[in-house]
UniProtKB/Swiss-Prot annotation:
EC number, UniProt record: 2.7.4.6
Record InterPro entries: NDK-like_dom, NDK-like_dom_sf, Nucleoside_diP_kinase, Nucleoside_diP_kinase_AS
Function field: Major role in the synthesis of nucleoside triphosphates other than ATP. The ATP gamma phosphate is transferred to the NDP beta phosphate via a ping-pong mechanism, using a phosphorylated active-site intermediate.
Keyword Transmembrane part of the UniProt annotation: no
Keywords: ATP-binding, Cytoplasm, Kinase, Magnesium, Metal-binding, Nucleotide metabolism, Nucleotide-binding, Phosphoprotein, Transferase
GO biological process terms on file: CTP biosynthetic process; GTP biosynthetic process; UTP biosynthetic process
Protein name per Swiss-Prot or TrEMBL: Nucleoside diphosphate kinase
Family matches, as SUPFAM superfamilies: Nucleoside diphosphate kinase, NDK
CDD domains: NDPk_I
EC class (word): transferase
Length: 137
């Protein structure tokens, strides 16, 4: 069964919409195989987003991701990665379809409520970054 990673970002955690977001995953047929609430260190955030290290937004992204707790979740199901990306909506909430997570809960392109793996290959890397195999059921 395909797995993907979701992160509920600090802005959405602060709005107290964790349950609403997780419920959308389940309603779409995705199973929560693992989840935890954590606070990223600067080192963790820089390592997780290392692919963007040379991009102009990198420092702001890292600063935002360490600004408060996040909820990291392994979602499992048929076409889990694509289904999660559809539920999230466009990166910029102003362009996200109504009813998507970002349209409903995000404030800006920076504070955009959720992260989701962008490929099956990256999903495996991202899941292994946050979870040991024994934590995923």
């Amino acid at each position: 069964m395909e797995q993907t990673l979701s992160i509920i970002k600090p802005d959405a955690v602060a709005k107290n919409v964790i349950g609403q977001i997780l419920a959308r995953f389940e309603a779409a047929g995705l199973r929560i195989a693992a989840t935890k609430k954590t606070r990223l260190s600067r080192v963790d955030a820089e390592a997780f987003y290392a692919i963007h290290a040379e991009r102009p937004f990198f420092k702001d992204l890292v600063d935002f991701m360490i600004s408060g707790p996040v909820v990291v979740t392994v979602l499992e199901g048929e076409n889990a990665m694509a289904k999660n990306r559809e539920l999230m909506g466009a990166t910029n909430p102003a362009e996200a379809e109504p009813g998507t997570i970002r349209a409903d809960f995000a404030d800006s392109i920076d504070a955009n409520a959720v992260h989701g793996s962008d490929s099956v290959e990256n999903a495996e890397i991202e899941i292994n970054f946050f979870f040991a195999k024994r934590e995923i059921h």
